[in-house]
Amino acid sequence: MAGLLVPTAALPASAAAATATTAWQNGSFHVDTPNVVRRSDIVLGKPNSAGAQSLPLGNGSLGTAVWAANGFTAQLNRSDTLPGRKSPGQVTIPGLSKMTGAADFKGYLDLYTGVLNESGGGMTLKAWVSATKDELVVDVTGADPNAAQSASVSLWSGRSPQAAASGAIGTLAETWVDNQEAGSSGRTFGSLAALSAGGRGVSAQVVNSTQVKVNFTPNADGSFRVIAGAPTWTGGSAGSTASALLGSDAAAAESSLLSTQQSWWANYWANSGILEANSSDGQAQYMETLRTIYLFMEAASMRGAIPGSQAGVADMFNFGQDHQNWTPSATWLWNLRTQISANMSSGNFALNIPIFNLYQNNLPAIEAWTKQQMGGLPGACVPEVMRFNGNGGDPSPGANAACSRPGSPNWNALDVTSGAEISLYVWQQYQDTGDVNFLRTYYPLMRDSATFLLAYQKVGSDGKLHAVANAHETQWAVQDPTTDLAADAALFPAVVSAAKLLNTDTSLQTQLTTALGQIPPWARTDYGHTQVLPPSADSSNNDVIAWSYQPTATTRNGENIDLEPVWPYNLITDDPGALHDLAVRTYNHRVFYGAGNDWNMDAIDAARLGMASEVASRLVAITQAHQVYINGLSDLGSSVGTEGYIEQLSGVATALDEALVQDYDGTLRIAPAWPAGWDVSGTVAVQGNTRVNVQVQGGSPVTVAIQAGSSRTMKVRNPWPGKAVQVVNGSGNAVVVSSTTATTFDVPVVSGQSYLVEQVAAPTTALPYAQVSGSPATTARHLGTVQIGIDGSGGTPGNGSVVSFKAHANGDYVTADNAGAAPLIANRTAIGPWEQFDLIDQGNGSVALRAHANDKYVTADNAGADPLLAKVTAVGTWEQFQLVHNGDGSVSLKSMINGDYVTAENAGADPLIANRTTIGPWEEFDLIDD
C-alpha cells in the first residue's frame, strides 16, 4: 500500500454549499420517488443481442433474463425447481426481429414499474413479470396485422418434459426426484412452462419433445400479446394448471394488467429507503444506480418460498439454461450477508423472510445433522454451506461437508459460527422492526445456535473458553479463531436479551452471562502474521488482529477474518480508543488488499471505522474489477459466464447505507463515513421501526430528520461536532432538546412523530425548500471501463479501438506532436495519424493510450508533474487513466498516478498535463471513434 490510512473527521459544517436546500417541509421528507428511481433505469441504445446483456424481470418467485436474440428471448427461472434450480424454459418471439433489427431501436428497463420498454421499426414492446402471479407478459404494437406470428417455449438436451398443446395453450411439464446428491431429500420437484397468446386465430402445437409453439395473427390494429406462465410444479394436470394460471390474461386490457403491476411496485418503492447521490466525476451517481438496481433485483427475486440467491449468484436472472456456478441445492451464508444487511437498512425486511425461513424451518434437520456430525453435541451447528433440506452435505470422513468433524480439515467442516451469524441478523431485524412475533418465531434458531457454541467450546485452565475450529474458510482447524470469539461476544448477549423479552430460558441466560466473561481477548499479531502477541502490544501501535491464535497456519481463502469483529459482528466501533486504533491498523495492513472477490467488504469495514475516502475508493475499485454485465451484475472474478452475481450490488448498497447512517450499537451516527465531494439525499431504516432522512450538500449535513416508529429515547451523535445543535419537532418546530454542543445527546421520541436535528445557528427550517428530484436515465451510465446499459451511436469505443480527442478548450484535436517526440497538445483542426490513439483496457477500471505517431504509450510524465508524452513501450501506473464520462457526452481523463484530471492547459495553447482536481471545459474532450 502507498501509505497508511486514518479515519477522516466528521464532515465540517463550514463546507456546506451556500445554496443548500432541504427537502423537509410540513413534517415530511419530500422525494419525487418515481423519477429518483428512474435515474437508474437501464438504457439500451442498441439491442442487447447476447444473453450476457440480458435484463432482469421478476416478481420474487418467477425471474426472467430477457435479451434480443431471435427477436426476443426470455429465460424463465425459479428458485424451487430443486435441487438443480432448473429453468422451466426459454421463450422466443421471432417476429420481434423487425423491431430489434431496426436502425432506430431503443429501449429501457423502467425500474419503478418493472416494465421493459422497447421500440424500433414502427413496433413497440412492453414486457413484465406480473407482480401478482407467475407469468411473463409481452405486449406488442405496430406489427403487420396480416403477417403470421409465433412464439415458442423450449428446453434443451438433458431435459425430458411432457410437451402438450390444447387449444391456445402449450405446456412443457417435467418432474424429478431429489435422490442423486448426498443428503438428498427424496422429494419430488419439477418445472412447468405454459405458453399462450392474444391475437387472432391462436392455436398451440407441439413442435418436438422439448418445444411447444403458439401460432397467431396480430389483432387488426397490429397489436398482440404473448404470455408465459411458470408456477411451482410438482406434478398433476399441466393443462388444467396452465389454464387456471393464465386465465383470461391473453385477452385482458393492458391497462388492467399494468394497474396491479404499477400499484405493487409503487408501494414497494414508497416503503423502500431511496437514495440519490451526485458527484462531479459521476462516481456517486454510478453507486446510486447500483444500489437502486439492487433494490429492484432483490424484490424481483427474493419473495419465493426458497431464497432466489444461494451463493451470491443472481440465480433468478440466469441466462445460461441450466448451468449453475455453484451447487444449486446449497446456500452459502457468507454470500448472503450483504443482501440481508441491505434489505434491513433499506427497510425491506420482508425480503429476508425466505432466508430466515430456510434456517428456522430446517432447525430439526440441522439439530439432527449436528448430533450426527459434531459428536452428539446439543443445539444447532448451522452449516455454512447448507442444503435446502437442512444438512451439510456428504457425511463421509474427509468429505467436503459443513459442520462435520469427520470432514475436517476442510473448507467448512469446522466453520461453527454460521448459526451465530444468521441469529444475529434475526436479532437485528427484531431491533429494527420491534416485531415481537417475528422474534418469537425465530428465537429457537438463536437459542439453539448459542446452545451449540456453549457445548462446543470448553473452559481451559486459564478460565477462558477454547476450541479448535475454522477461521471461516481462511484457516482450517485452528485454535480460537477470531470468528468464534466474535460470535460468542455478539450472540450471547443478544440471546440473553431475546430470552428476557420472551420470558424464557432462564438457565440458558445464566450460562450465557457466565460465558461472556470467559471469552479470550482478540488474538494479536504483527503485520506479517508471524506470531501471537499479547493485548499489551497495542501500546506499540504496530500490532493487528490475527485470524486466530495460530496466525501462521496455512491460508486457504482470501477473507479478511481479522475485520469480522468490525462487521458484521458489530463489536468494534468508530469510537476513539485503543480498540478502534487496533482495528484501523488491521484494516490498513489487511492481508487481502485490492479488488479480491466480488463480495469484498472493504468499503463496509471502512464505513464502520469512519474512513470516508476508503469507502469511495473501494466501492469504485471493486465495481470496476468485477462488474462485467450491463445490468449491473458482477462476476466472482472478472469473466462473463452464464449467470451474474448479485453480491457486489448488495455490498455497494450496504456500504452506502452504512456510510450515511449507522445505529448498530444504539448510537445514531449521521454521515459517519460519507465520501467528501458526494452530495446525497437518502433514507435509512434504523432501530425502533424508525426511518432517518439525511441530506449532505457541499460536504456537510443539511437535513437530519428522524421519523419515529416507536416511543423511546434515542442516543444521537452530534452531526456537527463541536457545534451547538438542537432537536425540534418536525411538524411544529417545538424544541425537544435544547441547544447543546455535547458529542452525544438523548432524544425522547414518540411513535408517529418526526424530529429535526439541526444547528442552532443554521436551522434546517430556514433553508429554501426543494424536494429530492430526478430525471429518468436516457443513456447508458459509465464508470471507467464498466457500464450499465448499452450505448447507442457515440458511446465508448470497444477495447483496442482507434480514437481521437477533440478538446472543449479550443475545439482542436489532440496530437502527439512531432511524431510523438513533443508533448501532447490540442492544436490540430483535422485527424491524421498523429491524432489517433489505440484505447486499451487495462482491466482495472483504467485505460491506456497508444499513439499511432510512434506506437508508444502516453505517460503522465514525472508522476504527472510534467506534460503528457507518448514515450514508453509498456504500461505502468503513469500510463493509466480513468475514462470519465461527463453529463454532456464528453469525456475526461483522470490520471491514475496522481488522481488529477488531464487539462488542455491555457485554453489549449499549452501541452496537456494532469494537474486539475475538478472538471471544467479545459478538462473535457469529445471522444471520436475513428
Where do the protein language model's features map onto the residues?
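C-terminal region of N-terminal signal peptides and the immediate post-cleavage residues
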Residues: L5-A20
